[in-house]
């Protein structure tokens, strides 16, 4: 296959050349199916595993349509996390660089005033998180948000998350400023086809529009994870999980490996980051309590391999494109099996081999069984590191490092900033209701 196949899908010549320059020459299944239908003007619901090229599946037809009349605000992409928004914006900018495309990023943690200025310049594409865009809709003037009333495309990336109650209020606010649904194309993409997403595909046809195109890439043998992914578990006592983690990361097999450690709580991420750093592991972290610039820097450090270990909450489980991750550790087991799939999807990408290791305590047995049922695969027991090695080599110094980390966090008031911000938000909500 050659880049002419993207041309046969209907992509503009300039875009085909841009993709070719980036060594993107063979369309994936989701791209082959969705690009032509979107170019026909159909709404689209696309489902495919993580790493399957969903961004190009919606970006390519949007850019092709935009280039036919490159004026004003043309499309909005909503996504649940800041990091995903920045990554999508990078891709749009790269694909459209030859056409002087203007892309605005509208996410939390950045200057609201600067974002308003960018929106006033009428960027061609807006990549946003729902909360921050909703803020502009409610509070910024007509000169800032007026262009949103004429957009041609709305994309919900990671639609299964955006359609949950967490985002419902902000999402409704964002949509309220847009043209009616029969005057715009609506594209939903997800790695998990939830009931909410499927319900939209079964909704009555919008008058004056062709029927919604729905496409889901079927998983081989009903397994929702790559065939090149090795899944293992390790039974670990809760109180010594840090010691086991350190022993694995510094073992001969993994001492040079690129690794993401997933945890369920921000405080756990911070404890592990500090503990491992004091033990001379090149580590960084990514969680919601970090200022946006720190979050951005952290992802960049990990991508550049300045840090080989990333400690993350599920902020990093969706869509982040980090080329080579050799090991994913579920330090905490997620309650939702689909979350495990998204975490595991950070490794074994593009046909490469990868490993996923679950730390399993007594309370996690049912969660692991639910994951195995979901992926239709039994995990193998991890045997590379045993109890004796942990006790002999790691336990004492890791325990001391953790104690120092906890003392430092207590002294710095870690978590107080979040409580303060929560009180501020609650105060704003009360003021908003009164007005």
Swiss-Prot record:
One of its GO terms (biological process) is rRNA processing. A motif (Q motif) lies at residues 4-32. This is ATP-dependent RNA helicase DBP8. Belongs to the DEAD box helicase family. DDX49/DBP8 subfamily. The gene is DBP8. Gene3D superfamilies: P-loop containing nucleotide triphosphate hydrolases. It is found in: Nucleus, Nucleolus. InterPro entries: DEAD/DEAH_box_helicase_dom, DEAD_box_RNA_helicase, Helicase_ATP-bd, Helicase_C-like, P-loop_NTPase, RNA_helicase_DEAD_Q_motif. GO terms for molecular function: ATP binding; ATP hydrolysis activity; RNA binding; RNA helicase activity. It catalyses: ATP + H2O = ADP + phosphate + H(+). Residues 244-391 form the Helicase C-terminal domain. ATP binds at residues 48-55. Pfam families: DEAD, Helicase_C. The keyword Nucleotide-binding applies. It comes from Kluyveromyces lactis (strain ATCC 8585 / CBS 2359 / DSM 70799 / NBRC 1267 / NRRL Y-1140 / WM37). Residues 35-211 form the Helicase ATP-binding domain. ATP-binding RNA helicase involved in 40S ribosomal subunit biogenesis and is required for the normal formation of 18S rRNAs through pre-rRNA processing at A0, A1 and A2 sites. Required for vegetative growth. One of its GO terms (cellular component) is nucleolus. Keywords: ATP-binding, Helicase, Hydrolase, Nucleotide-binding, Nucleus, Ribosome biogenesis, RNA-binding, rRNA processing. Residues 409-435 are annotated as: Disordered. Its EC number is 3.6.4.13. The Q motif is unique to and characteristic of the DEAD box family of RNA helicases and controls ATP binding and hydrolysis. A motif (DEAD box) lies at residues 157-160.
């Amino acid at each position: 296959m050659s880049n002419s196949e993207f041309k046969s899908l209907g992509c503009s010549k300039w875009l085909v050349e841009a993709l070719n320059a980036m060594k993107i020459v063979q369309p994936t299944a989701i791209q082959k199916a969705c690009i032509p239908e979107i170019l026909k003007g159909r709404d689209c619901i696309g489902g495919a595993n993580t790493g399957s090229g969903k961004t190009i599946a919606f970006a390519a037809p949007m850019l092709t349509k935009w280039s036919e009349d490159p004026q004003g605000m043309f499309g909005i992409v909503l996504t649940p996390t800041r990091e995903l928004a920045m990554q999508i914006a990078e891709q749009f900018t790269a694909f459209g660089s030859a056409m002087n495309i203007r892309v605005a990023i509208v996410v939390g943690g950045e200057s609201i005033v600067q974002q308003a200025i960018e929106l006033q310049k009428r960027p061609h594409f807006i990549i946003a998180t729902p909360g921050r865009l909703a803020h502009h809709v409610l509070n910024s003037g007509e000169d800032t948000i007026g262009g949103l009333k004429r957009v041609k495309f709305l994309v919900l990336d990671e639609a299964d998350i955006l359609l949950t109650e967490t985002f419902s209020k902000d999402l409704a606010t964002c949509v309220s400023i847009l043209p009616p649904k029969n005057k715009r194309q609506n594209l939903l993409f997800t790695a998990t086809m939830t009931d909410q997403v499927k319900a939209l595909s079964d909704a009555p046809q919008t008058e004056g529009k062709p029927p919604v195109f729905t496409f889901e890439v079927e998983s081989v043998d009903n397994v929702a994870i790559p065939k090149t992914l090795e899944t293992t578990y390790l039974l670990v006592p809760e109180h010594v999980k840090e010691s086991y983690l350190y022993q694995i990361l510094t073992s001969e097999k993994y001492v040079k490996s690129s690794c993401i450690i997933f945890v369920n709580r921000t405080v756990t991420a911070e404890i592990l980051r500090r503990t491992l750093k004091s033990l001379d592991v090149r580590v960084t972290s990514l969680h919601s309590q970090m200022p946006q610039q720190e979050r951005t820097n952290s992802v960049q450090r990990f991508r550049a391999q300045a840090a080989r270990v990333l400690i993350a909450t599920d902020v990093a489980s969706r869509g982040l494109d980090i080329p080579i991750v050799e090991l994913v550790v579920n330090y905490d087991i997620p309650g939702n099996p689909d979350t495990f799939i998204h975490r595991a999807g950070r490794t074994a990408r593009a046909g490469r081999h990868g490993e996923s290791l679950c730390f399993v305590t007594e309370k996690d047995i049912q969660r692991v069984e639910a994951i195995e049922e979901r992926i239709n695969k039994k995990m193998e027991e991890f045997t590379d590191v045993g109890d004796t090695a942990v006790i002999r080599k790691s336990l004492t110094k890791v325990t001391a490092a953790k104690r120092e980390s906890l003392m430092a966090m207590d002294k710095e008031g870690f978590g107080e900033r979040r409580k303060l911000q929560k009180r501020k938000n609650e105060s704003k909500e009360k003021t908003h209701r009164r007005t």
